């Protein structure tokens, strides 16, 4: 990957691995607020389903402002799962790079996004490019914008584990994106503090809450009727339904095997439980999961759910077991305990608030923590009723107002979460 990325990213990588803070300045980073603009062209770039869930509410909010012209560019790093989300939110891309290939590599994704973004950016010449989180699409789109000397706004900025291989490649992606970005939209105070430690200008950081909470206002309905035959058949009222998702690269192989074996043994021990596991389309994930759980009674392996199906399934479930970052934020907002199937999390606010627990990938630890929730109603209630630290449903508005403020079209800095 680094063969196509000159000194900037390599210098950042070296500084990061040495545990040092690199400070980069450029004309676009030191620009004062624009004062003579009447309209801002804002390009939102995303490519995966989790990004789309969190960016679509922002796109819809951008469309409300007369002095903002929104442009949507998708890379389709995840083709089918991305399209599901776009349809639900009614967002139609202006550009679709359509980069997804079977068994695609990180190098391949990087190359195709960088080349595709060059043409789009040169044609549209946006005033600012918005990227989200920690995907390869986000990092490379930010880099492409930097090469064109276009401002970058980083949505969901400041999350850190400080282990560049966990999660991989997401931790490095978000650190590199953070070094490029001109504006940083941090969900929480802790994320803000992380950026301050990295010498990011405090005036360029906005604490907004997380846009995923905005998304839940659209997707979760009390009277929602499931489209999935499997979900329609489940007795959510009389069974304890556990929603499971696990697909991260660092969990492939033995970690995922241990997760699946833990699920199998939990179901054996608790006959009133049902497990719903929407299995990621990655062949490496599907092969492992189906080989261990494919014939298991009361374990329902289904194709990935669209965002409305998933959010409403979580809202009616007993608890969630996941290695997903977004679900660590979504489930607590729906009052569901979460066991995180990872060794660490870049969302420690949830751990501190008591809405999630780190189960890791050890079979016995996963079983022990699951049994605590299944056996102890007080422990369950404590997690389910803990305050969600991630937002109030106003993150997209705050981001839009911050952009207007930065470009001189709003006189007051927006309120913060």
Region locations from a protein language model:
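A donor-sugar binding/catalytic signature common to diverse glycosyltransferases
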Residues: 131-132, 154, 184, 311-351
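Membrane-proximal helix-turn-helix segments that form the acceptor-binding/catalytic region
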Residues: 171-183
